[in-house]
């Protein structure tokens, strides 16, 4: 109890590092059409509803969260508006999916990562291009970018036609442990948000990227309900901890051990 109180006080002090905003992906603005060529939309053959997002990391591979997995999944690349089609949009289906078997944490939140090999490579275009894997881990207070077609309201089921983007900050992992009991100390996750609340990923943003310094550092995994609460940053899969596994799979070692 004392630890939680101390951490809560530290969180309040840390607010000085976060920019106050009245904005509610909850809390974002419409993304520029040219700023997310790596962002992909996931849906199924039986529904046109975007249930998750993902990230193109090369012409043949997409990174997302394992809890976004569905049967008959479809991957749309180059999309901005859900209703107005870009000329260079492409649709792909998985050739194979790779994920981490997790027996230690049955809820799956500790290893919420899935690597999808596309049946056919995509072609780079004005609105389709991969983003780099992290060359080093992110540090607390790093400024990052979130984006997705998820809910933009904490009180209503409001989903945008175009992806929304927002700037948030990495926070210390110890705070995640105190706030979320299901995040263990040895978890390969990170937390990020605006500690005053108001900016956050939300339902429908799962699997999407946390971009820091032009690299994907996180995958949207979980967080508070409702989204965007004060002192409750969201939880992201820490991509840096999986880079060796990702690169091994892509190189052809399909039996590579997940960390």
UniProtKB/Swiss-Prot annotation:
Entry's EC annotation: 3.4.21.95
Propeptide residue range(s): 19-24
Family matches, as PROSITE patterns: TRYPSIN_DOM, TRYPSIN_SER
Single GO MF descriptor: toxin activity
Keyword Lipid biosynthesis in annotation: no
One biological process term in Gene Ontology: proteolysis
Residues of this chain annotated as glycosylated in UniProt: 253
GO cellular-component term (any): extracellular region
Compartmental location: Secreted
SMART domains registered for this protein in UniProt: Tryp_SPc
InterPro entries, A to Z: Peptidase_S1_PA, Peptidase_S1_PA_chymotrypsin, Peptidase_S1A, Trypsin_dom, TRYPSIN_SER
Keywords: Blood coagulation cascade activating toxin, Disulfide bond, Glycoprotein, Hemostasis impairing toxin, Hydrolase, Protease, Secreted, Serine protease, Sialic acid, Signal, Toxin
Activity control: Inhibited by D-Phe-Pro-Arg-chloromethyl ketone (FPRCK) (98%), PMSF (93%), benzamidine (67%), and diisopropylfluorophosphate (DFP). Is not inhibited by BPTI, antithrombin and EDTA.
UniProt tissue specificity: Expressed by the venom gland.
Biological function: Venom serine protease that converts factor V (F5) to the active form Va in the presence of calcium ions and phospholipids. It cleaves the Arg(1545)-Ser(1546) linkage in the human factor V molecule. Has hydrolytic activities against BAEE (1.2 U/mg), TAME, and Pro-Phe-Arg-MCA (4.9 U/mg). Shows coagulant activity.
Protein's name according to its UniProt entry: Factor V activator
Lineage: Eukaryota, Metazoa, Chordata, Craniata, Vertebrata
């Amino acid at each position: 109890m004392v630890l939680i109180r101390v951490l809560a006080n530290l969180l309040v002090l840390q607010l000085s590092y976060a920019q106050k905003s009245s904005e509610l992906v909850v809390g974002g603005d419409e993304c520029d059409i040219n700023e997310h060529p790596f962002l992909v939309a996931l849906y199924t053959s039986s529904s046109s509803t975007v249930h998750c997002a993902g990230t193109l990391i090369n012409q043949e591979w997409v990174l997302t969260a394992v809890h976004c997995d569905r049967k008959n999944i479809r991957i749309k690349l180059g999309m901005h508006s859900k209703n107005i089609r870009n000329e260079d949009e492409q649709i792909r289906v998985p050739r194979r999916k790779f994920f981490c078997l997790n027996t230690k944490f049955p809820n799956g939140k500790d290893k919420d990562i899935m690597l999808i090999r596309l049946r056919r490579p995509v072609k780079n275009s004005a609105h389709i291009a991969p983003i780099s894997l992290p060359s080093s881990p992110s540090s607390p207070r790093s400024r990052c970018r979130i984006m997705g077609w998820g809910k933009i309201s904490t009180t209503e089921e409001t989903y945008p036609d175009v992806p929304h983007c927002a700037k948030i900050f990495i926070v210390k992992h110890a705070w995640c442990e105190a706030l979320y009991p299901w995040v263990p100390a040895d978890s390969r996750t990170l937390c990020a948000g605006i500690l005053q609340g108001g900016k956050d990923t939300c339902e429908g943003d799962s699997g999407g990227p946390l971009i820091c310094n032009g690299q994907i550092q996180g995958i949207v995994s979980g967080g508070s309900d409702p989204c965007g609460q004060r002192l409750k940053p969201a939880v992201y899969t820490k991509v840096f901890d999986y880079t060796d596994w990702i690169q091994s799979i892509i190189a052809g070692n399909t039996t590579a051990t997940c960390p």
